[in-house]
Amino acid sequence: MADNLPTEFDVVIIGTGLPESILAAACSRSGQRVLHIDSRSYYGGNWASFSFSGLLSWLKEYQQNNDIGEESTVVWQDLIHETEEAITLRKKDETIQHTEAFCYASQDMEDNVEEIGALQKNPSLGVSNTFTEVLDSALPEESQLSYFNSDEMPAKHTQKSDTEISLEVTDVEESVEKEKYCGDKTCMHTVSDKDGDKDESKSTVEDKADEPIRNRITYSQIVKEGRRFNIDLVSKLLYSQGLLIDLLIKSDVSRYVEFKNVTRILAFREGKVEQVPCSRADVFNSKELTMVEKRMLMKFLTFCLEYEQHPDEYQAFRQCSFSEYLKTKKLTPNLQHFVLHSIAMTSESSCTTIDGLNATKNFLQCLGRFGNTPFLFPLYGQGEIPQGFCRMCAVFGGIYCLRHKVQCFVVDKESGRCKAIIDHFGQRINAKYFIVEDSYLSEETCSNVQYKQISRAVLITDQSILKTDLDQQTSILIVPPAEPGACAVRVTELCSSTMTCMKDTYLVHLTCSSSKTAREDLESVVKKLFTPYTETEINEEELTKPRLLWALYFNMRDSSGISRSSYNGLPSNVYVCSGPDCGLGNEHAVKQAETLFQEIFPTEEFCPPPPNPEDIIFDGDDKQPEAPGTNNVVMAKLESSEESKNLESPEKHLQN
C-alpha cells in the first residue's frame, strides 16, 4: 500500500497541471526529492486531453459532482499532534460548471452501439433544453489507460532515433494512431431525428448542389473511432518564439512532444470567413486587399516591429484604446479589423495602444520560425505538454501517484510552516516545501478569492469553416463581439492530421471570458459558423457551412491573477499554482512556474539543459518497489540510465 512511499521529500506537489508539472521537472532536475501526486485518475488536471469516451466519462463525473478522490477510511484527525494544526483540502473539484452536451449526428440503430438518456430535440441551437438524467452508454469496455501505469511514465507514441530533432514540427497527415482512455462509461445527450428519411433528403439536396457530397457520419462512427479523438479541456496554441517553446527546447522536454504548424489565420467580417495575410508574401498575394491597402498594411507592420524606437508616433495615444489609435493611422476599416482581431488579437475596448503595439510586434516576431504563422499545436493535444514535463521529472527521480488523495496539510503552530501532508491512507509524508493547485484548496482558504470564469465549447464538425483545395488545415479565428464591451470569441479548428479527431471530421474549440453560462456566451457564434446536422431544410447559404455533429459546453474556473494574499491562513512554505487562464498562449503558466521556483530555490537554475550522458554518475539502483496488492495508487519512478543515454543538445537537430 502507500506505506511503500518514502516519508521524507524535499518537495511535495499536488496537482498535475502545466505549472505544477513544469515545477516538478525543475525541482527534480535541480536534485530535489519530488513527490508529485494527483487525486484524479488522469494527468493534467484541467490541462488534460481525452479520447471521446474519456471525455464523456469526465463529463459524467462532473455532472454527478463526484469527489475528486476516494473517500478515506482513516480518521486523520487522530494523526495531528498537540503542537500542530491541520488545514483541510477540498473534497470535490468545483472548477467545472454548466456542462451541456448535444449530439446532432444521426443515430444508426443497426450499429452495435446503444445510447441511453437522449435529450430532447434542439433543431435551432437556440431553444433551451431540459437536461435529463445522465445514464451509462453501452460502449465497448476499455481495458487500458493511456496515462502513466504502475511501472512507467507515458512514452512517446513513436520511438525517436538519436538523429531526430528536439522540437519536431510536422505537416504530414495522420500516420500514427494514439489511444487514450478514461474509464468505460459515457454520458451523452442526443438530438435525434424524428424522421428516418432526413439524412436521405439531405443527401438529395446536396447531390443537386455544386458542393461536393459529404460523407454521412453517425454517432456510432464517432464512438467507434473515439480513440482517434484527443480533446483538450483548455484550448491553447504555442507562440513559436514564446516562453513555452523556449523552455521545451532548453530543458529537452521537446523530445517527448511533436508539433504541427497552424496553417491559417482567419477573420470573420460582415458574416463571412476569410483568410488573413500574415507574411510579406501573403500580403502581396492577397486578393482581399487592394494595392493601396497592401502598402498601408506593410508600412504599419514594419512600424510595429520597431515601434519602441519611434515613441513620438504613439506617445500622445498611450491612454487611448488600440482601436482608436488604428483609426489615427488612417488604416481602412478592413485593415483595422485584420490588425485588431487577427494579428494583435486584442479586445476592441479594453486594449491600450501600448498593449496592442506590443501584441502586434510579438505576432510578427514569431512569424517564419517554423511556418507562415506564429503558432504551433502539439500533436495529440495540449495534454501532451504537462505529461512531457512529468516524464522529465521522473527521469531525474521524481515519484508519481495518481488517484492519491491528500486529506490535509499539517502545520506547526509555533513556526507557522507546513511540516507534512496526510494522505487518504493515513500516511504522513514530510517535506520542506509544498506546491498545490488552486482547486485543491478548501472553501475556507479561498473565501476571499474572486474567481473569473472561462466559457468553453467543443464541437465535432464534418468540414472546415473555410474550405480550400487542401483539407488538412489548422486554423485560428477571432469572432468580434456582437455588442460593444462584450468579449471576442476565439475559435481554433483542428484537422485530423493533428491527431485530435477522426478522418473526415474537424475538432473545433471555442473560448471566451465568461459573462453568462458557456452555452449562452458561445451559442450565437456556433449558429453563425455552423449548421446542425439534423436540420430538415438546407438552403444554399447553409450548404457552405460545416455541419455540427456533436457539441459540449462548459464553464471552467480561471484562477490566474489571484494574489497570494487573497488566500486565508496559507503557510509560508505552501505555494499555489493557478489553473488555465483565458489567454491564447501558455505564457502565464511558464512565468508562474519560474517565479515560484526562484522563490523556493533562488540559487538554482530553472530547468537547465540536461547533462551530457557521459557526465552522469549513478549512485546505484534506487527504484521504488511497486505497491503490492493495490489498484488505486499509481506510482512511477523512472531510472535515469536508459533515458539519459539518448539525451542530446536541444538545438542540435532543430529545423526551422
Swiss-Prot record:
Cellular localisation: Cytoplasm, Cytosol
GO biological process, one term: vesicle-mediated transport
GO cellular component terms, semicolon-separated: cytosol; nucleoplasm; nucleus; Rab-protein geranylgeranyltransferase complex
An annotated Gene Ontology molecular function: small GTPase binding
InterPro entries per record: FAD/NAD-bd_sf, GDP_dissociation_inhibitor, Rab_escort, RAE1_2_domI_C
SUPFAM superfamilies cross-referenced by the UniProt entry: FAD-linked reductases, C-terminal domain, FAD/NAD(P)-binding domain
Modification type Phosphoserine: residues: 649
Keywords: Cytoplasm, GTPase activation, Phosphoprotein
Basic and acidic residues bias spans: 639-656
Stretches the record annotates as Disordered: 188-209, 609-656
Subunit structure: Monomer. Heterotrimer composed of RABGGTA, RABGGTB and CHML; within this trimer, RABGGTA and RABGGTB form the catalytic component B, while CHML (component A) mediates Rab protein binding. Interacts with RAB1A, RAB7A and RAB27A, but has much lower affinity for RAB1A, RAB7A and RAB27A than CHM. Interacts with the non-phosphorylated forms of RAB3A, RAB3B, RAB3C, RAB3D, RAB5B, RAB5C, RAB8A, RAB8B, RAB10, RAB12, RAB35, and RAB43.
Protein family (similarity comment): Belongs to the Rab GDI family.
Misc: Substitutes for REP-1 thereby preventing widespread tissue abnormalities in patients with choroideremia who lack REP-1.
Stated role: Substrate-binding subunit (component A) of the Rab geranylgeranyltransferase (GGTase) complex. Binds unprenylated Rab proteins and presents the substrate peptide to the catalytic component B. The component A is thought to be regenerated by transferring its prenylated Rab back to the donor membrane. Less effective than CHM in supporting prenylation of Rab3 family.
Protein name, as recorded: Rab proteins geranylgeranyltransferase component A 2
